Amino acid sequence: MRWTPEYVLDGADQVYCRTTAAARHEYRKARYLADCGVARQWKTEDEQLRVDFVGVGGELCVRKCLDLPERWDDRDTEGRHDLTYQGKRIDVKATTNAVPWLIVRKTALPVDAYVLVNYHGGRFRICGWQTERMVKRDENTWKWEYAYTLKEQVLRCITELREWAGKDPPGADIRPWDRPDAHREVRSHRFG
């Protein structure tokens, strides 16, 4: 059984998440209004704020798990990734589903890794993580055509994220025979 840390936010963290979620919601609403000329409303105001609260809470829990400071100045302002850990761009995906899935749109901007967090019963549970290269594979489009979907069981343990980010250079998760320069590596091993 792999370790999946759980967090319950205290009062100060909850207030922080609510205010940050409200600020993000207002920013997104104003930006969309400026870009399109209309306010987008897929859900009620309360539902949209809850989605933002769960997202901010998930990011905060991942920061706590990785021993990162609880500040947001390393967050990408355009929404491409949620935090930077040892030079790696990480996007936190939070869900409230009883059975969590990592769902990434095919049009998502590039990051180095995705972390899945589930909010259920007042607790945030970090389900696992996976590299972008492993997420964006054709066999992961079996559920929806517009997104990549991965079950929680195929995600890596969050403790491995520390090792991956700390030791491996970008692209280290690529198998040697998938690299563009694989023929050079083989030649160098054969002929010394």
Residue ranges of each PLM-predicted region?
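Nucleic-acid endonuclease domains
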Residues: 1-86, 93-192
